[in-house]
């Protein structure tokens, strides 16, 4: 037979003991808080005496860290989703607004106000621009679709093909200081534009050759320059490749002939990468000066 008091003592001894724990956690010293926890465990329990105490503590720490990582990851995902959703909403609203705007504007737009469609330029035109200056023809000019022109230093000759049997009275030819306009009456001008350089209108002439070619003679104002084109806007020639007719040099006065010969010489020198007449003259002067002053050291001197 059991006594009631003994039963109560047995039941009370089987219950776990609860001890209050008081400590303050400082964010600056979290390890201090843990030290107090372990001190408390050592004083109030036999947990630290267990051989597996350290392993159990490590497992608990790892579990806490894993739990923290999961919580942070979940929070980061929520924060990243919100801006994306908002951005997507804004994009959808914009697209809807644009569509509504287009639908409402369509009936009121006039055909003339439609945006012009850009037409792709032919490859030939692009190639011409990229290719740069063209090689001159045998007359140091250019053969174009509607006319051709040749030149020497004093004059430019323009030849314009016209229907066979064309009479002079049907030709319209206006030669001004800086402009040339040529064509047939009642038709659009064949040539109409600003000249590359000015001419002397009083010394310019035109005539019909064999009733099928309008030939125009333009006398240059500056008779020491090669023209790159006859009318501005037309393809330009490479004046470095101009070849003057040597047979005509004898017709020039001595001064002009000397200048032309100098220009021809300089042009050939440049094409070969050699010094021009002016550069050669400077070199001769420098050599003479150096020979007259042997006492001076020019080894480190730089010459332009």
Curated annotation (Swiss-Prot):
Highest classification ranks of the organism: Eukaryota, Viridiplantae, Streptophyta, Embryophyta, Tracheophyta
Domain CS: 142-231
Effect on the protein of changing residue 141 to E: In bob1-3; general growth defects and reduced fertility, but no effect on the in vitro chaperone activity
Residues carrying N-acetylalanine: 2
Protein name: Protein BOBBER 1
Coiled-coil residues: 54-106
Organism, as annotated: Arabidopsis thaliana (Mouse-ear cress)
GO cellular component: cytoplasm
GO biological process: developmental process; embryonic pattern specification; flower structural organization; heat acclimation; inflorescence meristem growth; leaf morphogenesis; pollen development; protein folding
């Amino acid at each position: 037979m059991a006594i009631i008091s003994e039963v109560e003592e047995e039941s009370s001894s089987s219950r776990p003991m609860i001890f209050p724990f008081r400590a303050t956690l400082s964010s600056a010293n979290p390890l201090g808080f843990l030290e107090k926890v372990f001190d408390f465990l050592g004083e109030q329990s036999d947990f630290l005496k267990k051989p597996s105490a350290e392993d159990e503590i490590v497992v608990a720490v790892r579990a806490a860290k894993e739990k923290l990582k999961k919580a942070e990851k979940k929070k980061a995902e929520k924060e990243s989703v919100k801006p994306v959703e908002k951005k997507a909403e804004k994009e959808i609203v914009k697209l809807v607004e644009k569509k509504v705007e287009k639908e409402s504007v369509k009936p009121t737009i006039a055909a003339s106000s439609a945006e012009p469609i850009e037409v792709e330029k032919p490859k030939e035109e692009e190639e011409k621009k990229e290719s740069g200056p063209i090689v001159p023809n045998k007359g140091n000019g250019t053969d174009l679709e509607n006319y051709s022109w040749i030149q020497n230093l004093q004059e430019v000759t323009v030849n314009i093909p016209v229907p066979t049997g064309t009479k002079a009275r049907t030709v319209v030819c206006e030669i001004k200081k800086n402009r040339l306009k040529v064509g047939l009456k009642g038709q659009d001008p064949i040539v109409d534009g600003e000249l590359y350089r000015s001419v002397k209108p009083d010394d310019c002439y035109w005539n019909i050759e064999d009733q099928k070619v309008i030939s125009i003679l333009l006398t240059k104002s500056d008779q020491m320059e090669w023209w790159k084109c006859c009318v501005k806007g037309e393809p330009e020639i490479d004046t470095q490749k101009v070849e003057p007719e040597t047979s005509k040099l004898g017709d020039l006065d001595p001064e002009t002939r000397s200048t032309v010969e100098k220009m021809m010489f300089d042009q050939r020198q440049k094409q070969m990468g050699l010094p021009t007449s002016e550069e050669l003259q400077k070199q001769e002067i420098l050599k003479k000066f150096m020979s007259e002053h042997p006492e001076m050291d020019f080894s480190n001197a730089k010459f332009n």
